[in-house]
Amino acid sequence: MITGKQISEARKRKGLTQAALAELIDVSPEAVSKWERDAYSPSPEKEERLYHILGIPFLEDDGTLNNGRLFDEDHMSAFLKGKMSNGPFPEALKALTYAKEKHEGQLRKPISLQIPYINHPLTMTCHAFAMGLEDDVLLAALLLHDVSEDCGVPAESLPFSKEVQDIVKLVTKPKHEFSESAYYAAIAKNPKACMVKCIDRCNNVSGMAIGFAAERMQDYIEETEKYYPELLKVIKGVPEYNNAAWLLSYQIRSLLLTAKRIPR
């Protein structure tokens, strides 16, 4: 998916005004303005013309998107904004902006890769959409799940509904010493919190080979095998989550099996 930033930068490189580009694409200047602000996404037909007219390569030789990374923040943010703007997702749409602001300047581990932290909640939310999960509260909680833990914002102070606050509070690990068993037992009482935690774990497990030391990776595998089957069982008990439960179970188990085979 082409992003507003790509359109704007390529248009300026070509020396085109928004009005001039609009004429070439056969749309209004207002449409171009909205595309560049990621307020709306162009149709597939218009997107293809934008790539051609602006000279933006869709794929690099190695198959990654033209900015060098498949799971790019700009692409994911534009995709989510487009989906949420056209559906009943007021909290999730607000959470998209809020999470980006709060995680500004933070990086995902390992720091050497220079991946903005917001990549993590964005990937999780795209994962949810890919599994057919289109619940406003759940999507907002996915975007906000690390805001309390990593940005110092108390869950009860988040400018969102009580249900979203409760989920974020449940998945936030206390700063002080705590019982891991009690932490997961509390999460297991809330199916949406279970879903947030399982999607989070799936994303974390997928990147632990490059982000964790060997000992930390072993501990993470053991923690996952100990506590996550129960969370997945809770998710499976919710009819609308049944397919997602199967997918997450398959994905997490496959990743763990692969991780165990990595020489350490």
Range-by-range predicted roles:
Residues 26, 43-63:
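DNA major-groove recognition helix of helix-turn-helix/homeodomain DNA-binding modules
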Residues 18-19, 29, 40, 58:
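The DNA-contacting recognition helix of HTH DNA-binding domains
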Residues 66-264:
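Active-site helical microenvironments for divalent-metal-assisted chemistry
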Residues 8, 33-34, 43, 169:
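Key DNA-contacting residues within the recognition helix of helix-turn-helix
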